[in-house]
Amino acid sequence: MNPCVLPTPLPDLDGDKRWHSIHRRFISDCREKDPDVIFLGDCIFETVQDTEAWNKYFAPLHCLNFSIRDDCTEHVLWRIENGALDNVNPKIVVLHVGTNNVRNSAEEVAEGVLANVTKIRQKLPNAYIVLPSLLPRGQQPNKLREKNAKINEVVNGLTKGLYRVQTVAIDKGLVQTDGSISHHDMFDYKNLTNAGAKKILEPLYDLLSQILNENEPENDLTPSE
């Protein structure tokens, strides 16, 4: 059985139960707030919420960010199954997960992403589900970069034509002409600086704004190739 599609809580290796505490706080936020957009995911979107670019683009959009640093596909899936999207009715769910599934194949991870999409759809039948591409990682070209690119390719194929599911490439400008990634864009060659966040958030903001502002966006949006 593919472990990426089996809902699993993050192991409490430190023994302080922080992950479960964060999850419960997110559930509480759902009861108290009425977001238009919910972000679900991992370290990439957990860290960008502290950048100037996030405050510029997404703070005004009535967003909740339910991203947790070490999450893999199976951990986000567990959170969805255990209340992360209960008592809330956002117009859009942005799902970014998979880059931490380093021990799984690209195909397994893509199936894990699809399992999350399916579960989100069960919880929120009419919400738009937006899937930003996984980013390249590592200062120089490496196998994890290649795998993330393959995951993006497989996810595009698995989700093409699904109701109100949209993929969006957000990696433009991160890899330089010599194949390297600058620490000015990714401070640890995985997570983003403010400059890097601006590069990935602009195309995402454009898509979310279109969905939120159009009366009938499903007539204007076509699934990404």
From Swiss-Prot:
Database matches in InterPro entries: SGNH_hydro, SGNH_hydro_sf
Stored Pfam families: Lipase_GDSL_2 (PF13472)
Domain of life: Eukaryota
Assembly with partners or alone: Does not interact with Lis-1.
Family affiliation: Belongs to the 'GDSL' lipolytic enzyme family. Platelet-activating factor acetylhydrolase IB beta/gamma subunits subfamily.
Protein name: Platelet-activating factor acetylhydrolase IB subunit beta homolog
